[in-house]
Amino acid sequence: MARGSVILLAWLLLVATLSATLGLGMPTKEKRGWTLNSAGYLLGPHAIDNHRSFSDKHGLTGKRELPLEVEEGRLGSVAVPLPESNIVRTIMEFLSFLHLKEAGALDSLPGIPLATSSEDLEQS
């Protein structure tokens, strides 16, 4: 029995020694370079102000990062109408046209052709 315990203990010591030398044990986490937080902590706030972040890609900004320009005609400008507003404006103009047509305000205009349907012809 004592001989089996000695062999077991020797085997465990051999396995522990081999796993430590071959790197089979618990892997340690490697540190791979500087992060912005560690650089700011170690170098101070003046290093962060001059740091060019990853969002400063010239010409490769995302939709959320587009700056709103005040100038007209530039991409991202407030004055440029969105396609949704064009659709809404067209629908509003069409509805106002139908309202004027029902009210009879368009009958007196000479430039607009009369659009009569088959139902209108049957009623008259």
UniProtKB/Swiss-Prot annotation:
A biological process from GO: response to estrogen
Signal sequence extent: 1-19
Modification sites for Threonine amide: T61
Principal location class: secreted
GO molecular function terms attached to this record: G protein-coupled receptor binding; galanin receptor activity; galanin receptor binding; neuropeptide hormone activity; type 1 galanin receptor binding; type 2 galanin receptor binding; type 3 galanin receptor binding
Record key words, sorted: Amidation, Cleavage on pair of basic residues, Hormone, Neuropeptide, Phosphoprotein, Secreted, Signal
Keyword Nucleotidyltransferase applies: no
Record bears the keyword Signal: yes
Locations listed in the record: Secreted
InterPro entries xrefs: Galanin (IPR008174), Galanin_pre (IPR008175), GMAP (IPR013068)
Cysteine disulfide links: none
Pfam families registered for this protein in UniProt: Galanin (PF01296), GMAP (PF06540)
Residue numbers of Phosphoserine PTMs: S117, S118
GO cellular component: extracellular space; neuronal cell body; secretory granule
Maturation-removed propeptide residues: 20-30
Function recorded in the entry: Endocrine hormone of the central and peripheral nervous systems that binds and activates the G protein-coupled receptors GALR1, GALR2, and GALR3. This small neuropeptide may regulate diverse physiologic functions including contraction of smooth muscle of the gastrointestinal and genitourinary tract, growth hormone and insulin release and adrenal secretion.
Family membership noted in the UniProt record: Belongs to the galanin family.
Name of the protein: Galanin peptides
Originating organism: Rattus norvegicus (Rat)
Gene: Gal
